[in-house]
Amino acid sequence: MKIFLKNYTGQCVDFFRFGGNYGDSIIWHGTMNLLAELNIRIANVDLLSEKTNEILVIDGGGNFVDYYDDVRNFIIQNHERYKEIIFLPHTIFGNKQIEVLSKLRSNTTIFCREKESGKFVDSFAKSCNVFLWHDCAFYNSFEKSEMGKGILNAFRSDCESILKFIPESNIDISYNGFATKPLNEFLDTISQFEQINTDRLHVAITAVLLGKKVNLYPNSYFKNKAVFDYSLSKFPNINFINQDIF
């Protein structure tokens, strides 16, 4: 993906970053690191913005699925306005995306962050250029933290949870973040612990990069397992736990 993006070195692009939590902030910080390295400048846009540049870059994540509508609504309203559209690594699935994908043209390049999304997009975005690449969270570079003590249970309680019940000791540390929030508090919390149990993908990615022992559990669709298989399985300090625990 970096080789592809080098084509835009020295240029300014319109940049759409949807809202979110600390997981989205990890992605955004990684994206900013990458674009700064490549000397690509951005003009932030939203649903109410005028087009500033001919190229649109949509930040990566898991928003282009049926649970959420930010990316879908933005694309429906804006896809015909741009000379070129680039999706940074995304998870994409669901019936609501099919019609949108089918309308995108050959000026659209979509990076999927795991194979399941790649198959889905290949099936319905027939005119687009589709590639696999890793989540932009991996463009963050964190110093390994000290070992820490104890276990952090950091499970979600929203529509992507499949837990039977939330453990009493749970701290959903991702929930109170937002897409561009500084990472200090998030990193400091994870650093305090030796082991992290979570179904939050970017809690897991962050903890892995910090050198923690990590158990990643499924969410309500294929995202966690698919990203684990494509990107995280190579790390020795993480396991995927495909079973009920609570």
Which ranges hold each PLM region?
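Active-site anion-handling motifs in enzyme catalytic cores
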Residues: 1-246
